């Protein structure tokens, strides 16, 4: 939406066709300056650009003959499109919605009207000649401190303020060359996949840094529990996450000083540890963010709850899988009791299993009989030991690495028995 800034200029984002009949529209920040009698467009809000970054295009208002809504025949696939006719050239621009389209067309037509000056306002010819003959004086440019860095083998000079911090207009070069068309919207299914609760509001805003106090454009996303901002819309990991339970207040920033004095549509998010200064693209967008954050904080206070997606994220971390534990639990529940008991016999208990450093118990135990012990089991009974009934009398069986328990009879066979085999002797 176009808005009026502190210098009484009409500002806002529009999409302009790169070349006539090319069909390629680029996102630009437009400033309609009636005092300078021109329409300017920049890569982004000049407050967010580097010092010295000028307009990428301009048009004198006196050259504009007509501003009208584009017909479907002119731009059949471009909604909310209007055309500026100037000097036998046409400029096609695209607004965000119908109201934005109507406001821009009315503002441009009003600014480009030819007005007849009143009597006494026309300058005298002598004054005009005097101004023309006067030699132009070179304006003395203010001295600006620069910080020189070597990035990737290239010398980069960044303007800084005298207090040692970043410049007020510090910004990454080339960051805003490809701005998204929609600056604030509820994302659809084709956007960045959401891994948490559904988003209440999302869009691009300009945020002040905490350390260097530089202003950079970030993609903000608001859900039921947090406010996150990303470097761009396609990023999956946020640069920072602000829990809504830590937000104390969100309102328009009315008390401004220093760099904040020239910022329009500025609001602040006050938390327990820090105050975030965020600049929206229009007053409507600013009030929408303030109302959305306030409503989410109030809903969280009235109905406190934990995010339900935290456990699902922990279960699907890299290196683990939710499918590995679920089938095992299902199979263990469906397994027959005998089979389950046999599986448990193979896994020694940590509390009761024998270890090499454990002393051999002196009390005699009755282990599992040979006929009931599996042949391939690691837990074997002592040779020759068996109960008369063949019933397991002990709670655990001896592992093959465990020493045998001392016996009263050193030889377990009776030599007078006629049924004894020679191999047993």
Curated annotation (Swiss-Prot):
Glycyl lysine isopeptide (Lys-Gly) (interchain with G-Cter in SUMO2) crosslink location in chain: 141
Residue spans of biased composition, Polar residues class: 310-331
Chief location of this protein within or outside the cell: cytoplasm
The protein's assembly and partners: Binds MPDZ and PTPN13.
Keyword list, A-Z: Cell membrane, Cytoplasm, Isopeptide bond, Lipid-binding, Membrane, Nucleus, Phosphoprotein, Repeat, Ubl conjugation
Biased composition (Basic and acidic residues): 363-375, 400-410
Membrane topology classification: Peripheral membrane protein
PH domain: residues covered: 7-113, 198-298
InterPro entries for the chain: PH-like_dom_sf, PH_domain, PI-Interact_SigTrans_Reg
Protein's name in the database: Pleckstrin homology domain-containing family A member 2
GO terms for MF: fibronectin binding; laminin binding; lipid binding; PDZ domain binding; phosphatidylinositol-3,4-bisphosphate binding
PTM-bearing positions, type Phosphoserine: 184, 314, 349
GO annotation (BP), single: positive regulation of cell-matrix adhesion
Annotated SUPFAM superfamilies: PH domain-like
CDD domains assigned to the protein according to its UniProt record, in alphabetical order: PH1_TAPP1_2, PH2_TAPP1_2
């Amino acid at each position: 939406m176009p808005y009026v800034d502190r210098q009484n200029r009409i500002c806002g984002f529009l999409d302009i066709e790169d070349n006539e009949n090319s069909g390629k529209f680029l996102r630009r920040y437009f400033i309609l300056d009636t005092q300078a009698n021109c329409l300017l467009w920049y890569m982004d809000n000049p407050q967010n650009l580097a010092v010295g970054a000028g307009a990428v295009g301009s048009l004198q208002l006196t050259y504009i003959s007509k501003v009208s809504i584009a017909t479907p025949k002119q731009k059949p696939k471009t909604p909310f499109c209007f055309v500026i006719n100037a000097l036998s050239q046409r400029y096609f621009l695209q607004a965000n919605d119908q109201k934005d389209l109507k406001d821009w067309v009315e503002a441009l037509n009003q600014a480009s009207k030819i007005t007849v000056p009143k009597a006494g306002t026309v300058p005298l010819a002598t004054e005009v000649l005097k101004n023309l003959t006067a030699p132009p004086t070179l304006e003395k440019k203010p001295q600006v401190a620069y910080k020189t860095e070597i990035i990737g083998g290239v010398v980069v000079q960044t303007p800084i303020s005298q207090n040692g911090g970043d410049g007020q207009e510090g910004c990454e070069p080339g960051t805003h060359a490809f701005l998204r068309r929609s600056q604030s919207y509820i994302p659809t299914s084709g956007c960045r996949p959401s891994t948490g609760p559904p988003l209440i509001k999302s869009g691009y805003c300009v945020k002040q840094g905490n350390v260097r106090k530089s202003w950079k454009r970030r993609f903000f996303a608001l859900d039921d529990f947090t406010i996150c901002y990303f470097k761009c819309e396609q990023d999956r990991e946020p640069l920072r996450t602000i829990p809504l339970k830590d937000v104390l207040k969100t309102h328009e920033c009315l008390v401004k000083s220093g760099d904040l004095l020239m910022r329009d549509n500025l609001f602040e998010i006050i938390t327990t540890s820090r105050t975030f200064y965020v600049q929206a693209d229009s007053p409507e967008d600013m009030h929408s963010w303030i109302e959305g954050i306030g409503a989410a904080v109030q809903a969280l206070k009235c109905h406190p709850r934990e995010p339900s997606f935290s456990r699902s994220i922990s279960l699907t971390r890299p290196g683990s899988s939710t499918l590995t534990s679920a089938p095992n639990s299902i199979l263990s529940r469906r397994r027959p009791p005998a089979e389950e008991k046999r599986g448990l016999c193979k896994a020694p208990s940590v509390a009761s299993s024998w270890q090499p450093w454990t002393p051999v118990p002196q009390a005699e135990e009755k282990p599992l009989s040979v006929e009931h012990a599996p042949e391939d089991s690691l837990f074997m009974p002592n040779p020759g030991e068996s109960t008369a009934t063949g019933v397991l009398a002990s709670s655990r069986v001896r592992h093959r690495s465990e020493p045998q328990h001392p016996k009263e009879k050193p030889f377990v066979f009776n030599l007078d028995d006629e049924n004894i085999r020679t191999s047993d002797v």
